[in-house]
A protein has these predicted regions:
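C-terminal target-recognition/interaction regions appended to catalytic cores
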Residues: 107-208
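Class I S-adenosyl-L-methionine
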Residues: 1-137
Length: 208
């Protein structure tokens, strides 16, 4: 609707990888329908890209569609990967606060840690996956979702078995490659949802 109304010369569309496998009630691939509609007026290319290949300390994989209006007679070029090797991706330790800078409110309680351990054991016995994820500080972060405000278990910092914490708002901004002085509004929940729903700024910069 936006493209039909504004008719921009070009656009960049970002979405989760899951959209590639999403189907309608009648069994059609949603992405095929989208691409058919976009291709009426735009020359389009579609890619699956990692934000960590574009100077973002986060393994955030996304579908990127780039389109240029057909009357301009330009075919979009493939995005150029900035970080050529997995070994050169930015590790999350580069943007984390020092331990002494983190407020105690970010640390999990003894009860919460015990709950994680119990759930981990039950999941292991069932042969199922386990929800809580501990960051490997030498690698990019896991994807930060909008739901991170609920418990923060998608990406936890583990110093020891008894010292485990959630990421701070500042660290979440950095993981999405936003500058420290970037202003967020609303409650803590609102701010985390804004971060989780955003396109990582360095990712967008290189694509644009």
């Amino acid at each position: 609707k936006y493209l039909d109304y504004f008719k921009p010369k070009a656009f960049i569309m970002e979405n989760v990888i899951g959209m590639l496998s999403k189907k309608t009630e009648s069994g059609e691939n949603v992405i095929d329908i989208i691409m058919e509609q976009l291709s009426r007026n735009y020359n389009c290319i579609i890619n699956k890209l990692y934000a960590s290949d574009f100077e973002v300390p986060q393994n955030r994989r996304r579908v990127i569609i780039v389109g240029i209006r057909k009357d301009l007679n330009i075919i979009p070029s493939e995005p150029e990967i900035v970080i050529k090797s997995k070994e050169d991706r930015m590790p999350v330790k580069n943007i984390l606060l020092n331990k002494e800078e983190v407020d105690n409110s970010h640390y999990l309680s003894e009860k919460a840690i015990q709950g994680i351990n119990n759930k981990k054991q039950r999941s292991k016995e069932r042969g199922a996956g386990f929800g809580a994820q501990f960051l490997n500080l030498d690698k990019p972060s896991y994807t930060i979702p909008a739901r991170y405000w609920k418990d923060g278990y998608d990406a936890l910092v583990k110093y020891s078995d008894t010292e485990i914490r959630r990421l701070s708002i500042l660290e979440l901004k950095r993981i999405q490659s936003f500058p420290d002085d970037f202003i967020l509004v609303g409650s803590k929940k609102d701010m985390i949802m804004q971060i989780g729903n955003a396109v990582a700024s360095r990712f967008a910069y290189h694509l644009g």
